[in-house]
Amino acid sequence: LGNDKITINGNELRLTNFINPSDVNWRQSHCNVVLDCTGKFLSKEKLQGYFDNNIQKVVVSAPINNPEILNIVFGVNENLYDPSKHNIVTAASCTTNCLAPIVSVIHKNFEILKGQITTIHNPTNTNVLLDKPHKDFRRARSTMLSMHPTSTGSAKAIGLIFPELKGKLDGHAVRVPVINSSLTDCVFQLMKNTTINLSLIHISEPTRRPI
């Protein structure tokens, strides 16, 4: 590490420090694909700075609520990717990647009429380590000493991946004081009757083939 570069096994990676995508001289970098993992630029307009500087494709690490942008969950909808159409794609969110495969199997086999999602989630950088003022009193409490309910966009994000389920799922999150563990609890009302064993058969079947 030095001279604005990281060297790994003889390969040099250049380090830069800019606020906006348009501030970077991407042409000089000879790069045509960018992974945007800032979580800050979540619209076509905010990402336009990349394309104005010769970037051809952008992969965003957070979901974007825009029907023109493909939110991809592998094993569920990656077949929808069209290189000639999708210059921006996202990896959706961690909770959506947890939820979408289950929703896909259940909806395909039993048809989901509506559902409620609860995600038990470790703290993120929107939480605070110490009590401090906040417009949401629950978020004002120390995240490592409290459990507090908050909103989640995962249920709405499912509507981007399964348009026929838009508005049919609702959900909330509970932030809990653990370092790196999460789970998602789902309750669905289904069109077709099922049993525990039949549901497990359908859920386990995709695990026996490559994603």
Where are these regions (language model features)?
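N-terminal Rossmann-like NAD(P) cofactor-binding subdomain of oxidoreductases
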Residues: 1-140
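Generic hydrophobic alpha-helical segments
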Residues: 41, 124, 193, 210-211
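Alpha-helix boundary/capping residues
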Residues: 54, 162-165, 206
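Active-site-lining helix/loop region of Rossmann-like oxidoreductase modules
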Residues: 101-200
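Single conserved hydrophobic/aromatic residue that forms the stacking wall/gate
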Residues: 201-211
